Amino acid sequence: MDPSALQNMDRDALKKQIENMKYQASMERWPLSKSIAEMRSFIEENEKNDPLINAPDKKNNPWAEKGKCVIM
């Protein structure tokens, strides 16, 4: 961080930034290959229940239109 920026920050902002940096440093790091494998397995496990991939039954949808639009 730029030293001139530190002079302009107040004490509370510096404490908050230090807490944030400590939190980020304490996070467990994973290699990208492991992250991708975990994400892929999560997606494959939950794919069956995803309403965007498998549309729900239209008969049980209360918001689905019951009929066609009628022009008066």
UniProtKB/Swiss-Prot annotation:
<feature type="propeptide" description="Removed in mature form">
    <location>
        <begin position="70"/>
        <end position="72"/>
    </location>
</feature>
<comment type="similarity">
    <text>Belongs to the G protein gamma family.</text>
</comment>
<feature type="modified residue" description="N-acetylaspartate">
    <location>
        <position position="2"/>
    </location>
</feature>
<dbReference type="GO" id="GO:0046982">
    <property type="term" value="F:protein heterodimerization activity"/>
</dbReference>
<dbReference type="InterPro" id="IPR039227">
    <property type="entry name" value="GNG13"/>
</dbReference>
<dbReference type="GO" id="GO:0016028">
    <property type="term" value="C:rhabdomere"/>
</dbReference>
<keyword id="KW-0488">Methylation</keyword>
<dbReference type="GO" id="GO:0030424">
    <property type="term" value="C:axon"/>
</dbReference>
<keyword id="KW-0716">Sensory transduction</keyword>
<dbReference type="InterPro" id="IPR001770">
    <property type="entry name" value="Gprotein-gamma"/>
</dbReference>
<dbReference type="GO" id="GO:0005834">
    <property type="term" value="C:heterotrimeric G-protein complex"/>
</dbReference>
<dbReference type="GO" id="GO:0007200">
    <property type="term" value="P:phospholipase C-activating G protein-coupled receptor signaling pathway"/>
</dbReference>
<keyword id="KW-0844">Vision</keyword>
<keyword id="KW-0007">Acetylation</keyword>
<keyword id="KW-0963">Cytoplasm</keyword>
<comment type="function">
    <text>Guanine nucleotide-binding proteins (G proteins) are involved as a modulator or transducer in various transmembrane signaling systems. The beta and gamma chains are required for the GTPase activity, for replacement of GDP by GTP, and for G protein-effector interaction. This subunit functions in visual transduction in the compound eye.</text>
</comment>
<feature type="modified residue" description="Cysteine methyl ester">
    <location>
        <position position="69"/>
    </location>
</feature>
<keyword id="KW-0966">Cell projection</keyword>
<keyword id="KW-0472">Membrane</keyword>
<dbReference type="GO" id="GO:0007601">
    <property type="term" value="P:visual perception"/>
</dbReference>
<dbReference type="GO" id="GO:0007602">
    <property type="term" value="P:phototransduction"/>
</dbReference>
<dbReference type="GO" id="GO:0071244">
    <property type="term" value="P:cellular response to carbon dioxide"/>
</dbReference>
<dbReference type="Pfam" id="PF00631">
    <property type="entry name" value="G-gamma"/>
</dbReference>
<feature type="lipid moiety-binding region" description="S-farnesyl cysteine">
    <location>
        <position position="69"/>
    </location>
</feature>
<dbReference type="GO" id="GO:0050909">
    <property type="term" value="P:sensory perception of taste"/>
</dbReference>
<keyword id="KW-0636">Prenylation</keyword>
<dbReference type="InterPro" id="IPR015898">
    <property type="entry name" value="G-protein_gamma-like_dom"/>
</dbReference>
<dbReference type="GO" id="GO:0005737">
    <property type="term" value="C:cytoplasm"/>
</dbReference>
<keyword id="KW-0449">Lipoprotein</keyword>
<dbReference type="GO" id="GO:0031681">
    <property type="term" value="F:G-protein beta-subunit binding"/>
</dbReference>
<protein>
    <recommendedName>
        <fullName>Guanine nucleotide-binding protein subunit gamma-e</fullName>
    </recommendedName>
</protein>
<dbReference type="InterPro" id="IPR036284">
    <property type="entry name" value="GGL_sf"/>
</dbReference>
<keyword id="KW-0807">Transducer</keyword>
<keyword id="KW-1003">Cell membrane</keyword>
<comment type="subunit">
    <text>G proteins are composed of 3 units, alpha, beta and gamma. Interacts with Gbeta76C/Guanine nucleotide-binding protein subunit beta-2.</text>
</comment>
<dbReference type="GO" id="GO:0007186">
    <property type="term" value="P:G protein-coupled receptor signaling pathway"/>
</dbReference>
